[in-house]
């Protein structure tokens, strides 16, 4: 089939298109030589949110006497601002209204979060039987129709379970998966997952999932035709934390090629899944590339004629900034260099041990390439949440990464007996904190609690979460 939309496209022109549409300030948009202001995402907390979170924290920790409390009373806990999740959904709908979000349940499977997202019209990306069952258990009307089983390599029993629950949309990237679907779920709608260039992403997925165009066209489509399966469209994922958004352009371009092949073979593809990996801080750039590529390769005329819809699988975009983790300092060990707080000295004065770490809710440090910022919550029986947040906002708003305020340097360690359980090799705190004080970590809603373990028997189970809503009047 002749692909007239991309045939003989000069590489220089392509690069100029990309530069023109994406390598510009997030605060401006240039169209036909005219520059206008575009949406800027505000990822800072409002004063109302800060006050609500501080009050919630204060009410909880004021009941805890770390010297006399019962075991686990002083455990780490989360505060979740549901208003921040509402803001995330609103921003998505304002900037990418043509793309229906399917929240990646694996990112944070908190039932309250899932319910809130459902009420806001968000659907769900599930990767296992348990995730499917969790969404189905929430009492959402026609929940099975709002799930994509987005795992290209599935257990046979899970496929049968999806069929039993009428979850009828999934992804594949190999012929062997087609045989399983033909046997256990023959009426399931299939998206072929393409491999992408995610070399600039912090969390790369193409080393594990996705097929190239040749495999999709030469192997998967013919076999799906032979087996009588419903090929419903294309899926891809460019990885999380990407900085080069040209990979989105290329993936959508490849998707159009595959759509054309599907149409030429008699399939009726209706869905393009552009995956996840979106972050609020870079959403103006990534979303702009999505819109540009969709306009170029899936123009309105083509999409309307073939009734094509677009979906995505955002996870961290929706929940990362909504969660604050509060941890307790359970031990301190002063080092021989203690007391030297010269700002040029990069040696910690003491080691702090907290009751959460990389085997718990801070596993994102190891497995998600995150470096969560730590702040002082209490010291000498005083609460510093608002003060710390206001200082942080001031630094961010002034675009000043060189905080000249004197501080105390510590290394911070989790509670397990593993030397790998290091939260921070060097953290600069505003106070000389002691055993019994509390610390807090901001923006830890994504890939944290969902991957915590019970290593060393130090976890008492699900971490307590307190809820506020800064979006309420």
Curated annotation (Swiss-Prot):
Subcellular localization(s) per the UniProt record: Cytoplasm
Cysteine pairings via disulfide bonds: none
PROSITE patterns membership: ODR_DC_2_1, ODR_DC_2_2
GO cellular component: cytoplasm
EC identifiers of the protein: 4.1.1.17
Top enzyme category: lyase
This protein's pathway: Amine and polyamine biosynthesis; putrescine biosynthesis via L-ornithine pathway; putrescine from L-ornithine: step 1/1
Regulation: Inhibited by antizyme (AZ) OAZ1 in response to polyamine levels. AZ inhibits the assembly of the functional homodimer by binding to ODC monomers and targeting them for ubiquitin-independent proteolytic destruction by the 26S proteasome.
Entry GO MF terms: ornithine decarboxylase activity
InterPro entries recorded: Ala_racemase/Decarboxylase_C, De-COase2_C, De-COase2_CS, De-COase2_N, De-COase2_pyr-phos_BS, Orn/DAP/Arg_de-COase, Orn_de-COase, PLP-binding_barrel
Active site: 417 (proton donor)
Keywords: Cytoplasm, Decarboxylase, Lyase, Polyamine biosynthesis, Pyridoxal phosphate
Binding positions (substrate): 367-368, 418
Keyword Lyase tagged: yes
SUPFAM superfamilies tied to this protein: Alanine racemase C-terminal domain-like, PLP-binding barrel
Domain of life: Eukaryota
Modified residues (N6-(pyridoxal phosphate)lysine): 106
Pfam families given in the database record: Orn_Arg_deC_N, Orn_DAP_Arg_deC
Site (Stacks against the aromatic ring of pyridoxal phosphate and stabilizes reaction intermediates): 237
Subunit-level organization: Homodimer. Only the dimer is catalytically active, as the active sites are constructed of residues from both monomers.
Purpose of the protein: Catalyzes the first and rate-limiting step of polyamine biosynthesis that converts ornithine into putrescine, which is the precursor for the polyamines, spermidine and spermine. Polyamines are essential for cell proliferation and are implicated in cellular processes, ranging from DNA replication to apoptosis.
The protein's name: Ornithine decarboxylase
The organism of origin for this protein: Candida albicans (strain SC5314 / ATCC MYA-2876) (Yeast)
Name of the gene encoding the protein in the UniProt record: SPE1
